[in-house]
């Protein structure tokens, strides 16, 4: 069996038990998700690429810690968070700003609308990086990674209610920062942009 139809958990159990080639299948499935997480948390594409590689290196190194009842995605993101925290410690004191081109390209067939959406997405990324790391992370996990509150609570080691409160506060602050950067009032029409709607 080539492993293409196997669940992540079964693949990781195979890696743990010595079939390390299966890690390549897990990489193919999850490297984009991890890159998106790291890119939005660090604002640095090169660092995001390095961190993705680091996660899979750590998976291989610590494969024996993977338990029979572990959920692969939760285990993977625990490793990813540790890798990001270590990276942050090394770069402590540096001011992070999202790189040019970090925005998700628009698919709008209308040039003016596309430009407007790109500008709003850029503002949204700038606003995101003005939040604390804790608030930025809960937004990245809940909105970009589309993780359920229960999954985030498990990852962060807190109650589901705590996650809901953190997300609510983070969205409120992000909205305030976004409006401040854009110079628009809080009465801004939410239907104006699907791009911004995804977060605020």
Question: Model-derived features: where do they sit?
Answer:
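DNA-recognition helix of helix-turn-helix
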Residues: 85, 135, 144, 150, ...
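Arg/Lys-rich amphipathic alpha helix in sigma70-family domain 2
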Residues: 61-68, 78-98, 109, 117
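Internal acidic/polar
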Residues: 4-8, 94-117, 191-198
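Amphipathic, Lys/Arg- and hydrophobic-enriched alpha-helical face
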Residues: 27-45, 62, 128, 177-180
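N-terminal module of bacterial RNA polymerase sigma factors
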Residues: 1-33, 126-129, 190-200
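Structural recognition of an alpha-helix C-terminal capping motif at a helix-to-coil junction
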Residues: 36, 50-57, 70-82
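Amphipathic alpha-helical segment used for protein-protein interaction
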Residues: 13, 17-20, 92, 107-140, ...
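Short, charged helix-capping/linker segments at alpha-helix termini
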Residues: 2, 16-25, 35-54, 160
């Amino acid at each position: 069996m080539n492993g293409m139809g196997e669940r992540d958990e079964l693949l990781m159990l195979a890696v743990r038990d010595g079939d390390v080639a299966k890690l390549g299948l897990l990489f193919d499935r999850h490297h984009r998700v991890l890159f998106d997480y790291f890119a939005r948390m660090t604002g640095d594409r090169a660092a995001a690429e390095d961190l993705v590689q680091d996660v899979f290196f750590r998976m291989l190194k610590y494969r024996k810690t993977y338990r029979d009842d572990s959920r692969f995605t939760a285990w993977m993101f625990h490793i990813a968070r540790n890798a990001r925290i270590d990276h942050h410690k090394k770069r402590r004191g540096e001011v992070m700003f999202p790189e040019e081109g970090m925005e998700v390209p628009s698919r709008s067939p209308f040039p003016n609308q596309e430009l407007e959406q790109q500008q709003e997405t850029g503002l949204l990324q700038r606003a995101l990086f003005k939040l604390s790391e804790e608030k930025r992370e809960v937004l990245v996990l809940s909105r970009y990674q589309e993780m359920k509150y229960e999954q985030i609570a498990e990852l962060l080691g807190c109650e589901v209610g705590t996650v809901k409160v953190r997300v609510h506060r983070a969205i409120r602050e992000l909205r305030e920062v976004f409006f401040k950067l854009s110079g628009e009032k809080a009465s801004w029409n939410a239907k104006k942009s699907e791009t911004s709607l995804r977060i605020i």
